[in-house]
Amino acid sequence: MAVTITKRPPRLTLQVLDIAPETTAIRCLDWDRDRFDIEFALENGTTYNSFLIKGERIALVDTSHAKFGDRYLEQLWQLVNPSDLDYLIVSHTEPDHSGLVKDVLVKAPHVTVVASKVALQFLGDLIHQPFTQQQVKNGDRLDLGKGHVLEFVMAPNLHWPDTILTFDHGTQTLFTCDVFGAHFCNDDPFDSEPELLAPDFKFYYDCLMGPNARSVLSAFKRLESLPPVQLVATGHGPLLRHHLDQWLESYRNWSQEQAKAATTVAIFYAANYGYSNALAEAIERGTAKTGVVVEKMDLLTAEPQDIRELTEIAAGIIIGTPPTTAVAKTALSTIRAAAHAKQAIGVFESGVADAEPAYPLLNQFRDAGLVPSFPVIRVTAAPTDALFQEAEEAGTDMGQWLLRDRTVKQMKALDTDLDKALGRLSGGLYIITAQKGAINSAMLASWVAQASTEPLGVSIAVAKDRAIESFLHVGDTFVLNVLEAENYQPLMRHFLKRFPPGADRFAHVKTYPASNGSPILADALAYMECTVVSRLDAHDHWIVYSTVDSGRVSKPDGMTAVHHRKVGNHY
């Protein structure tokens, strides 16, 4: 008898509570969300936090994700009459926080939207209707009455170019949207159990804030002029009150460590222009996973001095083709004047017909002595997953190229005797293959071991800068192909090749699909279909633990290929 399993709808709940005088939090709890953006796997769901401040005038700080729609709006209008709402503060325009802005304005069209210049530009394109707006800059204030004086702090690139933070002098509450957040969903609205929150807090920082460490430190510098913060009202996860100093100090320390790194990549792009935002983020992910510091800057709004300073300190420069406007041409001229020979350079198209041509732009920098680290990323249609994979891998290629000398030095620095002793650890030879929709990846691996018997499980050490890393998050599936001792050379040679960004790893390789969709290598000795259960951070590697769901041996008398080393400083 066939059994049909119907996927149950995700659990979505609301939590309303007072967090400070005349200040109410509306927390939208998404218990079952398991992925946030293409690279961000979630183990503990997430929350979308929105806040009401009721002085003599009333302000709403951020809305929520559109998936909460009617239930959020019903709760909001129970807390405040639409005619009494005066301001809507948009911390930034990412849809998980601004997804219901248009709905709020439909019910309360008189409301003044308060945001940064860039955010107001984005909103105009998002909601397609006129609205009353108030642009704010760093240090601007908005007096709601009853002591609730709101001061705005500019925080670009945390993690969008339009981000602002809002400080209420009356309650000493800092509303931070994405900053200091965590994708962690539970009933406790505060950070009462730091040991439970800490892993997700760090993972969130690494994925979203770490790549912009210098911007984090700049935000801390701007916050120094404010009175002491008593409560951080985050946009995701628990609000930070009980262990606030610990969380803030962690952010500061992590960012200082990142900023001290000698290698920085600057990504210049035209925000909200074609597909610039999405492609810049994909390149940023790939670059950051190599360990370099990444700074993004909007060519259309950044000050020339900031563009020049970032260009001068960067070891690598990546440019998204901007419009052919006077502002953009001035920005490009500033980059060209500040760039110097031996810097790495890369260019990606924005997908807009009248954008600055990519190839002449790249050639200008090449002629000045800069070194292209990846081919121009072409955009001839709406981006696909394959294009985003190409962009991410291009960023990884630049990061690896910039760190090549440091990697060699680290290998040579290992004690000789210890190096030789580690080299006596041997392992089998395997190829990990993975497929997500139309995109795929593969990696030769030898640091593989059985890790459990109940359930059956394996562990694999995967370097953080490997392309396949983004295919091995919790819940992802893959195939572990075992190479045969008598027939491993052709497959090993093929998968040891350095593939250009976005290249098909399986071209001219005989495969057939596993039940989980990943490729099985026809010439492998055996294969196992696996599901990722957890990941352990091991400094420059992830230890990926996965359950084994099924498997098969193609040659019962065959033996596994073994990789014997003599030194331990490389695979």
From Swiss-Prot:
| Cofactor list | Fe cation
Alphabetically sorted, this entry's keywords are:
Electron transport, Iron, Metal-binding, Oxidoreductase, Transport
Annotated segments matching region Flavodoxin-reductase-like: 427-571
PROSITE patterns (alphabetical): FLAVODOXIN_LIKE (PS50902)
InterPro entries, alphabetically? Flavin_Rdtase-like_dom (IPR002563), Flavodoxin/NO_synth (IPR008254), Flavoprotein-like_sf (IPR029039), Metallo-B-lactamas (IPR001279), NADH_oxidoreductase_modular (IPR051285), ODP_dom (IPR045761), RibonucZ/Hydroxyglut_hydro (IPR036866), Split_barrel_FMN-bd (IPR012349)
Which parts of the sequence bind Fe cation 1? 92, 94, 159, 178
* Residues that hold Fe cation 2 according to the record: 96, 178, 236
Q: What class of enzyme is it?
A: oxidoreductase
What family does the Swiss-Prot or TrEMBL record give for this protein?
In the N-terminal section; belongs to the zinc metallo-hydrolase group 3 family. In the C-terminal section; belongs to the flavodoxin reductase family.
Name-wise, this protein is Putative diflavin flavoprotein A 1
